[in-house]
Amino acid sequence: MNSKNTIVYVKVKGKRPDGFVDPPVFEWNIQKEKKLWSLLSQLNDPDKEIDWALLAEGLDAPIYFLKRRCYELFTKHFELLRQQIDRKNKNALTDRSETPERDSTEEITKEVNFLNQLPVRTPGTIQEEFNEDNGPKDKNKTPDTTKKAIEQLKSSRILNFKGNKLDYNNREVGLTRYDSTYEKEGVHTEETESELSSSLGVSKSTLEEALMDKLQI
């Protein structure tokens, strides 16, 4: 019982106005309510008017009551229709907002899986790669090459020479030895010094280049 489905009649004492007729007594139930709505929902022509007298006779209810019930039924069903439309619009917006998030989550998952498949590079492996790129191409041949270069340097004219011309502290002694040696062989001292100087210069630069080439520097 509430204010929407309850009607209160108040009887006031006094003289009845002229032409006043007591409302007829009738019975209204859910079956008549459904029948009324089925007739109203099938009205397709908006210009066609409802025959209220015929409708009142068929439902055994007064016309004023049927008009009021029609208004209440239309209001109720329009409200239900509005709620359904709002619910569908809300669901559509929810689906649209969830779709991009789902796609972005799948992309992030693919990127993480790809990064997990990459080989792990530690500082040790990076240093090894650097040494391989910048070191000698053939590490096994490096000791042999160095040994050969040293042997060639030992057997060269510079290391086997009796006098050490590069020793500037004993420069005079060395020159004396050179002079005595070449005098015995009958070679002039000044010519010997110039030839020796040029020979030593060429031999030194040549050996340096050969040594650098062998060591792959």
UniProtKB/Swiss-Prot annotation:
It is found in: Preautophagosomal structure. Gene3D superfamilies: 1.10.10.2570. Residues 134-147 have a biased composition (Basic and acidic residues). GO terms for molecular function: SNARE binding. One of its GO terms (biological process) is protein transport. InterPro entries: ATG29, Atg29_N, ATG29_sf. Residues 126-147, 184-203 are annotated as: Disordered. PANTHER family: AUTOPHAGY-RELATED PROTEIN 29. This is Autophagy-related protein 29. The gene is ATG29.
